[in-house]
């Protein structure tokens, strides 16, 4: 992959991340608390913190990526599948960063 191709990959990923958050915020968050669903998830999860809940949700995507990697190079996933799984993992890492920073702010 050339530098120019990688820059294009980055821009597409950033755009997709913003698009995903715009859509999902209406479903899982409020203007007052973007992490509301993770805080409510504490009651449904085996974890006792919103960060633990987010990590649990993220692990599903990490496991999927691990499976994709284990099948390479013989079986290469579609771009659509790869972009979805990598994007979901990135999104959960951003959420985890925000949750941890929010805890430090309180």
Per-segment meaning from a language model:
Residues 1-106:
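Intrinsically disordered, low-complexity regulatory regions
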């Amino acid at each position: 992959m050339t530098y120019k191709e990688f820059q294009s990959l980055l821009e597409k990923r950033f755009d997709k991340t913003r698009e995903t958050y715009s859509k999902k915020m209406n479903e899982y968050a409020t203007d007052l608390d973007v992490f509301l669903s993770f805080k409510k998830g504490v009651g449904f999860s085996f974890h006792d913190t919103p960060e633990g809940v987010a990590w649990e949700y993220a692990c599903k995507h990490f496991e999927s990526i691990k499976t994709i990697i284990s099948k390479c190079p013989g079986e290469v996933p579609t771009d659509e599948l790869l972009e979805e799984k990598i994007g979901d993992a990135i999104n959960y890492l951003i959420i985890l960063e925000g949750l941890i920073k929010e805890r430090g702010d309180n």
